[in-house]
């Protein structure tokens, strides 16, 4: 199980690096669009669509690392005062809720991307093929489901008094 957790951590790190590349490309196209608007009179015709697709790609590629590091949004106003087994039970419940949501989102986003592929959907102005961009949603969600299942297993281990298998989570976030 430890090897699987390490692989998921490395995959999340790699996805985060790709998210950084998408962010740099997005910034570059915004900058080029502004420069071209002043010197040429208009930006690339497809730049607004491309920037939107890069933004969605960046956001979804960055999510798994946030989950691995437990740096996502949490409601700690309730759990801040909890200690010991009760805190682990709350963490297990939260992980089950997240896993359920991700599985549901995975099914819907897969159908969405597949239907886009069947229609050969393209963007309005740039006529860019959309289904590869839409496929990022279910692909990233699969990784999130795997990470949350790993965290569920890890929380059960910690409930039994064993140390966490996740090395990227900070000491204060590990329950």
Predicted feature descriptions by range:
Residues 1-175:
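Alpha-helical transmembrane segments and membrane-interface helix-loop junctions
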């Amino acid at each position: 199980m430890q090897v699987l957790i390490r692989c998921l951590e490395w995959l999340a790190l790699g996805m985060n690096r790709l998210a950084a590349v998408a962010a740099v490309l997005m910034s570059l196209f915004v900058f080029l669009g502004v420069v071209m608007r002043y010197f040429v009179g208009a930006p690339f015709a497809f730049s607004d669509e491309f920037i939107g697709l890069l933004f969605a790609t960046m956001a979804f590629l960055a999510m798994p690392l946030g989950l691995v590091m437990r740096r996502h949004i949490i409601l700690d106003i309730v759990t801040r005062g909890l200690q010991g087994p009760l805190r682990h039970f709350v963490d297990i419940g939260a992980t089950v809720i997240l896993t359920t949501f991700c599985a549901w989102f995975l099914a819907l986003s897969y159908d969405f991307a597949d239907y886009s592929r069947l229609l050969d959907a393209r963007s309005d102005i740039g006529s860019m093929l959309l289904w590869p961009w839409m496929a990022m949603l279910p692909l990233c969600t699969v990784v999130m489901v795997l990470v949350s299942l790993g965290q569920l297993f890890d929380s059960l281990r910690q409930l039994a008094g064993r140390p966490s298998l996740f090395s990227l989570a900070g000491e204060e976030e590990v329950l």
